[in-house]
Amino acid sequence: MALFEIIISLFVVYIIHNAISKYKKIHVNELCGPTPIPILGNLHQFGELPHRVLTKMTKKYGHILRVYMADMYTVVVSDPLLIREMYVDNSDIFTDRVKKPSVEHGTFYHGTVTSYGEHWKNNREIVGKAMRKTNLKHIYELLDKQVDVLIRSMKSIETSGKTFDTRYYITKFTMSAMFKFLFNHDIPEDEDINKGDTQKLMGPMSEVFQNAGRGSLFDVINITQPLYLLYLEMFDQSFKDIMKYHREKYNEHLKTFDPDVERDLLDILIKEYGTDNDDKILSILATINDFFLAGVDTSSTALESMVLMLTNYPEIQEKAFDEIKTVVNGRSKVNLSDRQSTPYLVAVIKETLRYKPMSPFGLPRSSSKDCMIGGHFIPKNAQILINYQALGMNEEYYENPEQFDPSRFLKVESNVAFLPFSIGIRSCVGQSFAQDELYICISNILLNFKLKSIDGKKIDETEEYGLTLKTKNRFNVTLEKRII
């Protein structure tokens, strides 16, 4: 009985201490936000679509606000000028990633995405150099080949009278492009990505995305973090399987590695990092993992959204097709060199990324010290999130933001609020590759097919919350061959 009373007393003391830490005033210019509760903070208010709840909160608290994700003081920002002030003007303060068990377990803070401090600076320099050394002609040929495979599959589906499983084939396209870019590996055209060799990687990667999308309360409660890390190390197999797969590819490359012949990004990383200690090898493996986790699902989400919006807005689809048809002038394929001649299609891509962001918040950053941003106090170790939904719906920068209207991007050369790949020195390192991938894929789909919903009605655009914002319900579309 005495032990039970002690436990209850300690719990009560913890609750009181936790509440005081959240309620106390930290600065005269501290951020406003909803009232938190002990332990949970504001998590109980987020619902199924936290990014939309936080977007609604901007009406009351403005485009920079404070919430508590359990014990984690979090700054949510959707004002592009404040984002620039943080990530560009004060990049030395807002470069680091957030430290928590799920990140440490999966990456050991190596690679380019989750590392921080001097380790990140070194990785960024090496990976940046590796990306610059990547042969552009090789990338163009790589993407062209993968588009050819996709279009052949779509033609076969159209001829058979079946419907097009958007998520499956788009994911296979982005995954095949990444396999070729990283490993110089061709996924067989008839291979089911849910089976065979690719499933060894895609299976555990799907689990990682599902788990990360759901999140864990223990990841953001200070007192439980050490135990949660131990739990992950003991029982979570997904990241171990992923790293095992990457190590197998790494070992295969070492057997045939020639420093004078750079076959893919892995070869370049081996050459740039070296292989003389375990830390360098881990950085190589973590970087490869970064490209897969950050590149495959985000690009497939964006392309799936483009198919969705073009199907739901046939008049926009026809206008984009007419532009493409005029530019190719009888050719059977759109090339990357056609991009400058297709401003409306580029506007469609941009509008889709604004209207249907790839990710709710991108990758969180952390403040390395107390600072003032836009007259607001940001404490040390605050988690920083960009709310891309609220950013894209910010009425100060977008007229009638609830409307899907690509022409808004034709009226001005650029919009300071358009930041789908973030901004500053820690923006997406694969941005150029992703932009090429999105353009070459959707342009050739439009050139070859008219996209229609199966029942003639609009497809449900509701998204499902996760690391990326895919549609809640998978959808197929009907393909109608274009006459060009």
Curated annotation (Swiss-Prot):
Main location: membrane
Protein keywords: Heme, Iron, Membrane, Metal-binding, Monooxygenase, Oxidoreductase, Transmembrane, Transmembrane helix
Listed cofactors: heme
Transmembrane annotation, as ranges: 1-21
Protein localization: Membrane
Residues given in the record as heme binding sites: C428
EC nos: 1.14.-.-
Gene3D superfamilies to which the protein is assigned, alphabetical: Cytochrome P450
GO molecular function: heme binding; iron ion binding; monooxygenase activity; oxidoreductase activity, acting on paired donors, with incorporation or reduction of molecular oxygen
Alphabetized InterPro entries for the sequence: Cyt_P450, Cyt_P450_CS, Cyt_P450_E_grp-I, Cyt_P450_sf
Membrane topology: Single-pass membrane protein
Pfam families xref list: p450
GO cellular component: membrane
PANTHER family found in the cross-reference section: STEROID 17-ALPHA-HYDROXYLASE/17,20 LYASE, STEROID 17-ALPHA-HYDROXYLASE_17,20 LYASE
Record family assignment: Belongs to the cytochrome P450 family.
Official protein name in the record: Probable cytochrome P450 508A1
Organism per entry: Dictyostelium discoideum (Social amoeba)
Gene: cyp508A1-1
